[in-house]
């Protein structure tokens, strides 16, 4: 029996949602570069769920449905207020809150196609409110209700900080959402598909995916990148800090990727937004330090930056707390998780691999008195 640790290189299913071929990422055949430069996140949601881009009426209908379903049940807000959430990592709070949503959804266990689409809308609509409500309540602030005249990216930033974001900020966050929406069969997406392949409900599948994303080997890299940038603090300290890390064979977060060999195609878009945002905010050092780190690392190792590296300075420049970086990943990836859940339901087969047994050989039971 041949064992492939971590299932690396194993093709476990067929999918029409996204592909990574020769370091090119596509959603339903559309190059990520094309989508990042031109598409709204709402268009990408529709694309992933319907395998085609929407027309104008379909896009407006989706936006209206997301806006109409964006408010949280009061029970979740009260839960955040009662629980000592200052001691909880936001991913733990997000996992619990999404699971709670299922308790208040009368269609949670209704499995027909139309009910699943309605649940998809509710989940995608409410996850920004969960993250922003958590963020504000732990600071002693009241949650801010979403505005129906704002788009998805604009509403998130508004609910987080209470200020109307600038066009540059909206563009940057929309681009980040588009870039993180799906990524083929990553760990959290595979987890969601394994869960719903048992014919469990959508809330269970998404909750399982969030649990997988919570692990530091999947989510959290951009949070670690920002921690590194804060430790370095100045452009003058970069060279000594990075060379010391590399000399001691320590890992530099935000570089390299399990799938991409020549480079993550998403990184350049966030690099550009990092430059624009840090200049606009009068804090160019975060971009300058990042580019210097990239120069030093790539001069010594064949490891180009991945999507996490420049997203750190982008999110920081948008006024987002560092421990919210991974929950924001979930806000975007919710669209991809749902797309894969819907696809799994459509052509389902229980996912049940085998394991190579490496324990002791056959043994005879010994009564406890004789042990």
Annotate each PLM feature.
Residues 1-371:
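Non-transmembrane, aqueous-exposed alpha-helical and coiled segments at domain scale
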């Amino acid at each position: 029996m041949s064992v492939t640790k971590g299932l690396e290189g194993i093709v476990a299913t067929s999918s029409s949602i996204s592909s990574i071929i020769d370091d090119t990422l596509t959603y339903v055949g559309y190059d990520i570069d094309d989508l990042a430069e031109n598409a709204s996140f709402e268009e990408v949601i529709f694309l992933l769920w319907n395998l085609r881009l929407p027309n104008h009426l379909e896009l407006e209908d989706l936006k209206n449905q997301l806006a109409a379903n964006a408010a949280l049940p009061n029970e979740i807000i009260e839960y955040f207020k009662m629980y000592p959430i200052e001691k909880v990592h936001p991913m733990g709070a997000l996992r619990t809150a999404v699971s709670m949503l299922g308790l208040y959804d009368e269609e949670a266990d209704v499995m027909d196609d139309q009910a699943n689409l309605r649940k998809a809308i509710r989940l995608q609509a409410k996850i920004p409110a969960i993250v922003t409500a958590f963020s504000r309540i732990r600071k002693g602030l009241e949650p801010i209700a979403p505005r129906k005249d704002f788009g998805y990216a604009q509403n998130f930033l508004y609910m987080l900080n209470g200020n109307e974001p600038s066009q540059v900020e909206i563009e940057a966050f929309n681009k980040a959402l588009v870039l993180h929406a799906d990524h083929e069969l990553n760990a959290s997406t595979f987890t969601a598909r394994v869960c719903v392949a048992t014919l469990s409900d959508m809330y269970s599948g998404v909750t399982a995916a969030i649990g997988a994303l919570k692990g530091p080997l999947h989510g959290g890299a951009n949070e670690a990148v920002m921690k590194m940038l804060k430790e370095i603090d100045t452009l003058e300290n970069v060279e000594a800090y990075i060379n010391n890390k590399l000399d001691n064979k320590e890992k530099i977060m935000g570089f390299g990727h399990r799938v991409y060999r020549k480079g993550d195609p998403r990184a350049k878009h966030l690099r550009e937004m990092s430059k624009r945002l840090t200049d606009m905010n009068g804090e160019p050092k975060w971009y300058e330090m990042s580019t210097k780190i990239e120069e030093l690392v790539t001069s010594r190792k064949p490891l180009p930056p991945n999507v996490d590296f420049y997203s750190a300075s982008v999110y920081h420049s948008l006024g987002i707390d560092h421990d919210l970086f991974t929950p924001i990943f979930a806000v975007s990836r919710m669209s991809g998780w749902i797309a894969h859940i819907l696809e799994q339901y459509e052509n389902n087969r229980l996912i049940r691999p085998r394991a190579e047994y490496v324990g002791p050989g056959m043994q005879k039971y010994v009564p406890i008195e004789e042990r």
